[in-house]
Each structure stands twice: as C-alpha cells, then as structure tokens.
C-alpha cells in the first residue's frame, strides 16, 4: 500500500479513524455484559461448564464466519488460507480462542462485569512483557516498563493492594483468577499474531482460528453433556451480537491498522476497559462498584498505562 493510496482512503481521516477505533472498543467493552446477559437468557448456571463451552463455541464459530465474510467483502475476494497456514491457525486458535475464552467465560460466570473488565486489561501489559522477554519481538524501553507498572498498579489497587491480594480474600480462581488466565492467553496470542502475520493475512488468521477454536469448544461442551437451548428470540439476538463483537471489531481494527500507523490506532485501546466498566454499570446494574473512588482511580491507572505502553511519536 503506497502513501498515495493511503492518502485517498477515508480510514486515514483522523475523526473517522478515532470514531471507528472507539466503536471497536465499545464492541470489545460490551463483551462482558453481553456474556453475563447470555447466561441469563440461555439459563446457564454458573456451575454448568459444558453448556458454557457450547455457548462460547457457538459464538466463535459464528464470529469466524462473519470475519471471513466481512474480510472477503472488504478485500473484494474470497479469503482462503494457504495450506501452509493451517498450522498457524491451529496454534493461534489454541491460545486466542480455546484457552482465552475457556477462562473468560468461566470468569464471567463467577465475578462481576466491572471486575472482569479491569482485570482483563492486564493482557495489555502482559503482551509487551512477553514480546520483550519471551518472544524477543521488541526491545525493552523505560516507557513500556513504566506503562506496565502503572497498569498493574491499577489492577492491584482495585483489589485493595498487595496485602489484600496475598490474603486471598478478594480473589477466587474461578472468578478473578480465571480472567487473569484469559489475559495471559490473550497476550500470548497477540505475540503469535505478530509472528504469523508475516506469512498470512491477519484477517484470514483471525477468522479461521475463531471458527476452528469455536468448533473445538462447542464439541467439548457437547460431549461433556452440555445443552444450548434457544428459549426466545432474545437468545438468537444475543448470540448474533456476541459473534459480531469479535468479527466487527477485529475486521475494522485490522482495516485501521492497514491504513494508519500502528501507534496512532493502538493508543486508543485505553477506551476498551473504560467501556467495559461503563457498559457493565449500565446493563448489569453494577454502578456502585463501577463508579466507586477505588474503581475510578484503578481504571485511570490502567488506561494511562495502556496509553504509555502504546504511545509513539509519529514521524513527520
């Protein structure tokens, strides 16, 4: 893509880029309340792991189909992976969909949407740490270390400090601990995408890994005795929306990254946890927890950390 081509694209217009990025963050932020609402409309109990896996699987199979269709329409050609890419798709699905969302769906059955949104933001700080020290994809910098430190400080503060965390009182593995595991898998998958996208279109990787990972989760849930019963039209609408969350956000975000400097787009990711907290307050009735002084300070530190980690001066 040449600079001349970039300059002609509407996606390079700053207001459009910002609005689209924020829309993506609204979609991602709505995932926590959407999943908790899904448990209600599908009548899935917190202890029903098998049915929960079927719900997650159905969501991501649908998201995979949507992503490939949306991507094909934008590219004006069918997005089909190369034979050599299936190993990348399989590895990516293991981390980005199977691992991450096994724990993500577990967590939201056992904790609040507000807590889930703030803890899940830790993936933004695990990712650069893994990229620097584990995968050697980036060089360490004071700026990134400061950003990660601020972000983790915000998450620790949310639970009342290290003393409260080490006492074990505010954290359960099935709730907050599971969301931390989900963030871990998210960070690893982000590093995998950076590596694998050298060999395959990232939209193809995302779409097909969603579908593959979703199918695996669905089959595991089905074989484990789960049920996914559509009690009303609300069940269909909820599932379609959850599929669109991933497909719409990943597709649009990918388009923005294609036409703009990465840092100009990724720095707006700070909106994601904010939307998660706000939407949990609006749709789940968690306003008291969301707008407490402790939550707001924690959210400020987390968001500031994301900005610092991703901010880079743009070349003139």
Where are these regions (language model features)?
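Specific alpha-helical transmembrane segments that line the substrate/conduction pathway
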Residues: 54-57, 61, 65, 105-139, ...
């Amino acid at each position: 893509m040449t600079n001349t081509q970039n300059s002609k694209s509407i996606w390079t217009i700053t207001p459009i880029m910002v609005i689209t990025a924020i829309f993506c963050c609204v979609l991602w932020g709505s995932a926590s309340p959407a999943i908790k609402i899904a448990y209600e409309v599908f009548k899935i109990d917190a202890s029903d792991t098998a049915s929960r896996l079927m719900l997650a699987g159905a969501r991501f199979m649908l998201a995979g189909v949507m992503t490939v269709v949306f991507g094909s329409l934008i590219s004006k050609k069918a997005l089909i992976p190369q034979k050599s890419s299936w190993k990348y798709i399989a590895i990516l699905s293991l981390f980005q969909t199977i691992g991450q969302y096994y724990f993500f769906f577990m967590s939201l059955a056992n904790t609040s949407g507000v807590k889930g949104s703030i803890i899940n933001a830790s993936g933004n700080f695990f990712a650069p740490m893994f990229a620097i020290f584990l995968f050697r994809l980036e060089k360490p910098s004071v700026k990134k270390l400061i950003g990660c430190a601020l972000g983790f400080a915000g998450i620790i503060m949310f639970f009342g400090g290290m003393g409260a965390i080490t006492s074990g009182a505010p954290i359960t593995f099935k709730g907050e601990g599971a969301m931390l595991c989900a963030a871990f898998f998210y960070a690893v998958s982000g590093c995998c995408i950076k590596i694998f996208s050298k060999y395959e279109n990232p939209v193809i990787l995302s779409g097909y890994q969603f579908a593959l990972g979703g199918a695996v989760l669905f089959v595991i849930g089905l074989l484990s005795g789960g049920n996914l019963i559509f009690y009303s039209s609300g069940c269909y609408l909820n599932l379609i929306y959850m599929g669109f969350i991933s497909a719409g956000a990943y597709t649009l975000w990918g388009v923005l990254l294609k036409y703009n400097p990465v840092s100009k787009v990724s720095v707006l990711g700070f909106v994601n946890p904010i939307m998660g907290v706000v939407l949990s307050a609006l749709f789940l009735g968690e306003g008291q927890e969301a707008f407490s002084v402790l939550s707001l300070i924690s959210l400020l530190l987390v968001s500031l950390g994301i900005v610092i980690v991703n901010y880079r001066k743009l070349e003139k």
